[in-house]
Amino acid sequence: MSANDAARGANHRRTALLHCVLVAVLAAVLALGSAAVAAEIRLADDSGRSVTLKQPAQRIISLAPHVTELLFAAGAGEHVVGTVEYSNYPAAAQRIPRIGDSAQLDLERIVALKPDLIVVWQNGNAQRQLDKLLRLGIPVFYNASRRLSDIARAIEQLGRLAGTETIASPTARAFVAREAGLRQRYARLALVTVFYQIWDKPLMTVNGDHLISDVIRLCGGQNVFADLKLLTPVISTEAVLAADPEAIGGVTAEPGQAGNLDGWKKWPRLKAVARDNLFVIPADLITRNTPRILDGAQQLCGHLEAARARRGR
């Protein structure tokens, strides 16, 4: 082989090697780009806004007790770095730093915690405060779940935002299955008319759009004030007496407390009183849009089942 042939062969090999290197580098760049795109999370929140995260959230602030509980249910509890007062479940939530409450937030504290995601309660946080948060440039995700059917979806959403789908998805499926089991057992039974008292002074109840009404329907009950326009309307004693519900439910802060329904015993001819159908359920189990709502639902279903059995009285 001549010297020229050897030189041409060497050049050819160098060119081929350079080509291979360039192809490998290009492939690596494309792979990195694809990974970056794949890691990006884009999700519509309950207000219809599109929320984009460059990667799963690692430092989350929750602005409602039920949102905190949902984040833990979705497997993202360890990523929650700040929350509001009354975030008391699970026990680990009680150790999370507080940044205010639904009425007043400590914006400086929020910024100092360096969150990469803030989850707010669209129906419960003051809009003026939310507007300030949006101006900070931190991704804000609105949760507005009101129905039982919204809870599993919220768990799935939060799991996706935090990259904890392997926990969130089975948790959501288990919730749906348990709800379906309760619905199958109770929803087709004879309707029981129900007045649900959430406050006594002034006397307040819920309309048909409230989560409590959804639970009442699940259990085969009918809210006697479902048609009122306000979500939590003030009503009169006379309106309750005229409706003459078969059962009266209430809320209590802690399990085992008596609640505030004793005042109805002044009217012994009221069906709920005459048949001993006054009951209370811990507020956190009947008013929070979390998996524990089904614990409260199970209690409520049991009370309505007892009310059916007492119709002969």
Predicted segment positions?
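Extracytoplasmic substrate-binding proteins
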Residues: L43, R49-S50, D116-L117, W121, ...
